[in-house]
């Protein structure tokens, strides 16, 4: 490949059960593939999506991007609320403008809002500790650490089933775009707890096939249900406690045990 094209897709923050980043990321993935096909057809050059390159560390070296203490990339005007895709081209493509990109400065200094807001203290003075991040353990197929289970579906924690954006919500660099936050979700908690074939298909279409794993969805949903309204969902949690899935059954049994306290 002789040229690289970085595609940026901004999105509006929101979602309670499912963070809007994940649907935006899936949409960006498909848009990048369509763009590659279009470049190949209209420009007569080979174009393909580069999935083997890590974009976050690449962007840290580019002056247009800032980097937060949460290790996320930031851009002027949209903060950290964007998805990235990279295309590799066999030949450079003429651009309409050579205007310089705005410099992305992120004066974190001694702000510390993200570190103070993180419920698991994953952002420290020495850097970001991914093993402490709730998102790191979500939908992994393994049981979440016990100290994190009470935070799923809780206003004090992630509030949802997939995604934790607390550090982004409180960041001053996201102040403007946070004005457009919505609580809209594509699924209800009841739908996720049932997780029918239709729900899985919709889930795959919106978030991607990689996330459409029934047991992994249920393992997160049962924690959210138990923390949100344990009595309302007790019967469903009891049924899921018999699941052959280790993570799902352990999460359900944990919630039932803690309901009795």
What spans do the regions from the language model cover?
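Loop/turn-rich, solvent-exposed surfaces of beta-rich toroidal or solenoidal domains
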Residues: 177-178, 206-227
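Short coil turns that connect the paired helices of HEAT/ARM alpha-solenoid repeats
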Residues: 203, 208-213, 239-248
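Immediate flanking context of iron-sulfur cluster ligation sites
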Residues: 99-109, 153-164
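Iron-sulfur cluster-binding cysteine motifs and their immediate structural context
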Residues: 113-138, 157-184
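Structural detector for internal amphipathic alpha-helices that build alpha-solenoid repeat scaffolds
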Residues: 218-228, 250-259
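Auxiliary alpha/beta "docking" domains used to position bulky ligands
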Residues: 1-107
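Amphipathic alpha-helical scaffolding segments comprising HEAT/armadillo-like alpha-solenoid repeats
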Residues: 186-189, 199-203, 230-241, 260-261
